[in-house]
Structure formats: C-alpha cells, structure tokens
Amino acid sequence: MSAKIKVDEISSIIKERIENFELNINIEETGKVVNVADGVASVYGLKNVMANEMVEFENGVKGLALNLEENSVGVVILGSISGIVEGTSVKRLGKLLRVPVGDALIGRVVNALGEPIDAKGPIEYSETRFVEEKAKGIMARKSVHEPLQTGLKAIDALVPIGRGQRELIIGDRQTGKTTVAVDTIINQKGQDVICIYVAIGQKQSTVAQVVKKLEEYGAMDYTIVVSAGASEPAALQYLAPYAGCTMGEYFRDNSRHALIIYDDLSKHAVAYREMSLILRRPPGREAYPGDVFYLHSRLLERASKLSDELGAGSLTALPIIETQAGDVSAYIPTNVISITDGQIFLESGLFNSGIRPAINVGLSVSRVGGSAQIKAIKKVSGTLRLDLAQYRELQAFAQFASDLDESSRKQLDRGQRMVEILKQPPYSPLPVENQIVIIFAGSRGFLDDIPVSAIGKFENELYSFIEAKYPNIFEDIRTKKTIEKDLEENLAKALNDFKMTFSVK
C-alpha cells in the first residue's frame, strides 16, 4: 500500500522555510590605490565613502578617509605603509575610528589607536568610544571652582589652576615644560585624579624616561601614557591627542576627575601640516592649512567641568607649546593662547640663571583659576605678584644706582627672598599646606634676617619642625582651607620658635 502524501503538511513546511529564509549578502564597496607617498594613499573607486570614515587595505592596515575629491579619496594610513602599493585594494568599513577607554588602560603605555606598546600583554577593555567627540555645550558645564594643585609654589600661589580649566605651558626648548607637567601628575597622588600624558612627536627615549619617573614616584598607578613617537606616521601623531582626550572624557563622564597633558601641540600642528600638504590642501600662514586653529580649538574645548546634573566630573587640560627664541607672537602660540584660559610662560633666561621652575610671573596668567584657589593661599599670596613686579623694577634700577634708600633696600632684600622661596627642585611637589607656611613666612618678613643662601635649608627644616612640634597647623590648614586670626598667631609663634633653634651653618 503506497504511503499517502500529506499535501497540507508539506506546503506548511515549505511556507515556514520561505518565511524564515534570510539572504545574507555582504556588499562591500572597494577601491584601488592609485598612488601612495609619505603615509598617504590616493584611492580610486570609493564613491560613497564619508569624511573621517575608516577604510581597510588588503593587508589589514587601517586608514582614515580625510580628503574627498571628485575622482579619488585621500586616505591617511594608520600603520606601516610597507605592502601598500599601486593597485592594492581598499574596502570601506562604514564606521568611524574608535579607541578603547576605561580603567583597564590605567598604568599602561598605548599608541594613538589605544593598542599597548609596553610589552605587558593585551588590554582587557569593555568599552570603546569615538576619537572625535563634540565638545559639551554651555548648559552641560559648570564654572571652574575646585582647585587642581600642581604642588609648585609659583603656580599654586600666582597662576592657580582649577579642575576643568585649560592652562597652557609655553616656553623655549629645555626650559622645564615637561618637568612642570610631570610634577603636576606626581602631585595628584591620593587626589582621585586620573592623569593622561600624551607624547606627540617625542623621541622614544624621552617618553621612556618620563614613564620611568612616573613609575619611580608611584604615579603610573593612576596614569595612562599615549605615545605617538617621532618615527611614527604623521597620521598617528595627529590622532594621539584626540585619542587621549577620549580616554579622559570617559572618566569625566563617570563623575570622576581627569588631567590630560599634551606634550606638545607644536609638533601636533607640524604633523597636521605635513599631512595637509601631502593631501594637497592649500597652505596658509607659515604653510599651515587654513583650519589649523580649529584643529586645536576642537581638542581643547573638550576639556570641561560638568554640571551637577551630569555628575560634576572634570577634565583639565595642560597643553604644551614650544616657542622659538621666546617668540610668543608666532602663529601656533597665539592660536593656543587665545583658546586656553591662561598660560604659564617659562623663560630660558630665568632657567639659565638658576630660577627653576623658570616661570615668568609677569607674563603668566590664569583667567579662571582665581575662583578655584583656596582662601588660605589666596590670603598669604595676595600681594605676591605685585611685590615681585616691584622687585624686578627695583632690581633693574639698582644696577645703575649705587645708593638706595632704606625702604628700597628692604624691598630688594624681601624680593630676593621671595624669588628664592618660589624655587623648587624637579619631581618634588609640595602639599598646599607646606606652600602656605613658607609663603606666609616670606611675605610677613620672618625671613628678612635669614641669608638668601640659607633659605632652602630653612624651608626644609621648618616643615620637619612644624610636623614635630606644631602638627595641628598643617591639619588646620588642610581642613579649614583658610587662615583665621588664631591660626595666624599660632603660625607666627611656630616661626619665631623655629628661628630660635635654626642654625645657618
């Protein structure tokens, strides 16, 4: 007996199969390399590619579409150009460049793409973010009101920095710009601030030295180092600051505080100029392309102090600019000065005369940091800037005048001691309470009878003396953050007691 065919059952199975059928066709738009030179490839055939879209070469190297022309696309190569020749096929990836973010990066040295370069194994990250993010709007921000202590007396007293500020460090080569930045990172220990140090166009040996110093002082426990060395393609040097900024924004957006240092944006502008000229973009002043201002403004505007509704996190930026022979009126320095909230100007003349950090107090300014400065340091350093300016004027006058009146001589002597107080050896940031004590001693005349050569010894021994005999002074300054009459009297008593025991020899 022949089996009866169940027509209804078969037709329902066929219908179900048709309904569940998925046609997986992966359509890829590809093009060919027309020519390649200096890390930039000209690609024909990618008709629908978008600006800043990622592309991939047949050998797996990624690229970034920067120039969209009528018949070709200018692609900067994010890696080695070996193996990329005329005729190499390129495919669109349909996405923008992203980098890993999060706590997994802390303590690591990565390149501009967030890949580890410190031989400590892969990074187990759980989140990535776009390298190019839009800066927060006005309503998402809050005015800068919390201090970010650098540990340097000259900065914390005269050019204070607040969390969420952009403060430029500017000066000639070999004037201690990186040292100021590294000191600031070291001083964030225990302050719950994540630091990101972005090295752009630096020698690998220089970056290794910085990392070694940070490890030596235990600062790598809260620091990420992003390095795009001098030997790396201009495209990676161009991307490094944006990648570092994205990593910092992750902490800011999660109600935490971050500090980012761009060392330095002069080399960043040079890398962008190199890329732009190879892409045949029209050059402008000093051969930089027309959008070089936007290059830095869109980066530095991302630093901010967020409103309470968004978690009150902050990202503070300390960009570094290298000048030529102290010329701050060049194109890139003036651009960055106009973008930032103030600048710390380092002078080679001061550096060579032994005043280190070599900060020119007259030219350095902080436009918003004053509202973030704690009351105690504001009180003791209130007239310090004016006193130093008058001292410099008198000093210039004293070179020509042989006899000075008593008040001028006193002013000169006091000024000399204040300059000596503001000197600080590298990699030894001071807690703010120690800074307040020594500036109080100098500005109130307690050091007038101490020889200038003995000021350093006096300062070091004073901290130990107060710690041992008057520990409540440091504690009161730390907790109250202001100097009231009783604390002022107690501090004056401590200074007088110490002077009785202090020996110059």
UniProtKB/Swiss-Prot annotation:
It is found in: Cell inner membrane. The keyword Phosphoprotein does not apply. Keywords: ATP synthesis, ATP-binding, Cell inner membrane, Cell membrane, CF(1), Hydrogen ion transport, Ion transport, Membrane, Nucleotide-binding, Translocase, Transport. It comes from the Bacteria. GO terms for cellular component: plasma membrane; proton-transporting ATP synthase complex. Its main location: membrane. It is a peripheral membrane protein. SUPFAM superfamilies: C-terminal domain of alpha and beta subunits of F1 ATP synthase, N-terminal domain of alpha and beta subunits of F1 ATP synthase, P-loop containing nucleoside triphosphate hydrolases. It holds the Pfam family ATP-synt_ab_N. Produces ATP from ADP in the presence of a proton gradient across the membrane. The alpha chain is a regulatory subunit. F-type ATPases have 2 components, CF(1) - the catalytic core - and CF(0) - the membrane proton channel. CF(1) has five subunits: alpha(3), beta(3), gamma(1), delta(1), epsilon(1). CF(0) has three main subunits: a(1), b(2) and c(9-12). The alpha and beta chains form an alternating ring which encloses part of the gamma chain. CF(1) is attached to CF(0) by a central stalk formed by the gamma and epsilon chains, while a peripheral stalk is formed by the delta and b chains. Belongs to the ATPase alpha/beta chains family. NCBIfam families: atpA (TIGR00962), PRK13343.1 (NF009884). This is ATP synthase subunit alpha. It comes from Campylobacter hominis (strain ATCC BAA-381 / DSM 21671 / CCUG 45161 / LMG 19568 / NCTC 13146 / CH001A). The lineage of its organism: Bacteria, Pseudomonadati, Campylobacterota, Epsilonproteobacteria, Campylobacterales. The gene is atpA.
